[in-house]
Amino acid sequence: MDLGEKINTVERLVIDASRVSRYLGYPRKVPIWKLEFNLPKTCYIFRENNNSDIAIDIENMMGFAIVPALSEKEAHNRLKTLIPSIYIKDKIERL
């Protein structure tokens, strides 16, 4: 099993999304969701092709993610595959 990359969530970490153009094109536009979350001091991130379109910003064990997904539940599940140890702290917002 791949352990992913260990990150220190106290320091600032910004990961930009890639491959976003496939979600923004006509005829079907995928909704974009903003999720705010808390993290432990150190955790693992599992960046792969199927979640490289997720952007995250982390600092002081808190952060937010911008996730393209068809539903709120799918957005939550996609973020959990990227960072399994997250705790969603607020309502998920559709942008």
Regions found by a protein language model. Name each.
Residues D2-N50:
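Short N-terminal "domain-start" leader segments
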Residues D2-Y23, F64, E72, H76-L95:
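Short, mixed-charge low-complexity intrinsically disordered segments
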Residues W33-L35, I45, V67-A69, A75, ...:
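Hydrophobic beta-strand residues in large extracellular and virion-surface proteins
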Residues E36-N38, E59, L70, E93:
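A structural detector for beta-sheet-dominated domains
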Residues C43, I54, I86-Y87:
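Short glycine-aromatic motifs
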Residues N49-N50, I54-K73:
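A short, exposed loop/beta-hairpin motif centered on an aromatic-Gly-Thr core
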